[in-house]
Amino acid sequence: MALTKAEMAEHLFETLGINKRVAKEMVEAFFEEIRQALENGEQVKLSGFGNFDLRDKNQRPGRNPKTGEDIPISARRVVTFRPGQKLKSRVEEANAGK
């Protein structure tokens, strides 16, 4: 099961007792801030959680799986996420007994 933005807003509503519309706007604003920073080429560091980074990938050879034809995969910039040590530890602890 995946956690959705709607579920995050619902959690804010239940936990903080704020209006549902305001909770949804807060979640949207949080992610919009991250999007804008990445669009501007900035790294996003969330203490205790992890970092969103931009990485440039060079052009490389690829292959069309249907035809087997060689085709170049163009150079591009991708977003990567590196979890922080606290997040890694909590996930490991949560899954240790499973």
Swiss-Prot record:
DNA-binding found in the keyword field: yes
GO cellular component: cytosol
Region of interest called Disordered, as start-end residue ranges on this chain: 49-72
InterPro entries, per database record: Hist_DNA-bd, Histone-like_DNA-bd_CS, IHF-like_DNA-bd_dom_sf, IHF_alpha
PROSITE patterns: HISTONE_LIKE
Origin superkingdom: Bacteria
Function noted in UniProt: This protein is one of the two subunits of integration host factor, a specific DNA-binding protein that functions in genetic recombination as well as in transcriptional and translational control.
Subunit note: Heterodimer of an alpha and a beta chain.
Protein's recorded name: Integration host factor subunit alpha
GN (gene name): ihfA
